Amino acid sequence: MSPAFNASPNQLTLALSKGRIFTETLPLLEAAGIRVTEDPETSRKLILPTSDPAVRVVIVRASDVPTYVQYGAADFGVAGKDVLMENGMAGLYAPIDLNIARCRMSVAVPAGFDYANAVRQGARLAVATKYVQTAREHFAKKGVHVDLIKLYGSMELGPLVGLSDAIVDLVSTGSTLRANNLVEVEEIVQISSRLVVNQAALKLKRERLAPILDAFERASAALA
């Protein structure tokens, strides 16, 4: 690892992704007395300082948060349950459901498509998703025959252009589905974001981490 990236032994590094998770994590940080001093939406920096000189924030892709924490490039991070389900929890400790960035992972199909009948008839369905592992496990448990198509974005486009019969994606309000003439037919799992901690950091930096974890737990309990 580059020496320029390495934190001092007493410094804590928190991995966050831009967007909703970052925004909804800010009040939890403030509950721990920590304020991020730059906005990742306007700053070009990927390592952001905070009001606590011993804590810094690294901005990474949502799907990369567990990797940074697992390998110790970050001591702790915030990741969606969807990411953790898809990528596994090796080397991670996930002590707290933060009750933020809540949504659900669901199966959606074009309006008018009889999904239940297709399943009953044993039809083989093409399903577009970025959650291939999670979708595979879900459909296998239900005995549904599927061909999974890995996409990285714009899942709703799949059925519109004939790429897939259905999609598996995250749904919050459902407005994007409706705008693309899709309907939610099956909920797979409720999603929220979790605090994940590097197992080695939990042992070696427990004294520094414990007050922050306690503050996160208290603040997130109020959101439940």
From Swiss-Prot:
Q: What is its main location?
A: cytoplasm
Is the Glycosyltransferase keyword given for this protein? yes
Which keywords does this Swiss-Prot/TrEMBL entry list?
A: Amino-acid biosynthesis, ATP-binding, Cytoplasm, Glycosyltransferase, Histidine biosynthesis, Nucleotide-binding, Transferase
Q: Which GO terms describe its cellular component?
A: cytoplasm
Question: What SUPFAM superfamilies does this protein's entry cite?
Answer: Periplasmic binding protein-like II
Annotated localization? Cytoplasm
Q: Which InterPro entries match?
A: ATP_PRibTrfase_cat, ATP_PRibTrfase_CS, ATP_PRibTrfase_HisG, ATP_PRibTrfase_HisG_short
- Which Gene Ontology molecular-function terms are recorded? ATP binding; ATP phosphoribosyltransferase activity
Q: What EC class is this?
A: transferase
What's written under domain?
Answer: Lacks the C-terminal regulatory region which is replaced by HisZ.
Name listed for the protein in its UniProt record:
ATP phosphoribosyltransferase
The gene name reads hisG
